[in-house]
Amino acid sequence: MIKAAYCEAISAVNGLGLVKLMGRYSGFIARDACMSNQNVDFCLVPELPFELEGPDGLYEAIIERINEKKYCVVVVAEGAEEGLINPEEKITKVEKKDESGNLIFDDIGIYLKGEIVKYALSKHKMPITLKYIDPTYMIRGVASNTEDTIMCAKLA
């Protein structure tokens, strides 16, 4: 999926490929996917604090990267909102829980999809061609490889 986002990003003017991967409380799936693919510019995970706006924020970093390379690829774990430094930037305003008692997060991928484009237009007058990919259920439907099977057996 990251390769698809990369292909979409490089084939568009000011292209941005945004991929949301599983990872509510841990970003190891997003991290490992980024490490195995050399085309990712930014990886957002719940464990590492980050800002969206401001001079050191994600939005400015994306603009800078697009200005340099003409494209950018971002991978975000679904629970990355937990890493936001500024509580006012949180997208989940009301705490909700599912039947099992797990927190329900608002969709950070959809949120970023809209906000990055708006930010680039309003602050830099830069139109961005953003392609958003959410392969969550496709990942669950694939048979595990040998390493995953061994790890699961050890954890069990």
Protein language model annotation of sequence segments:
Residues 1-128:
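Accessory alpha-helical/coil subdomains and C-terminal extensions
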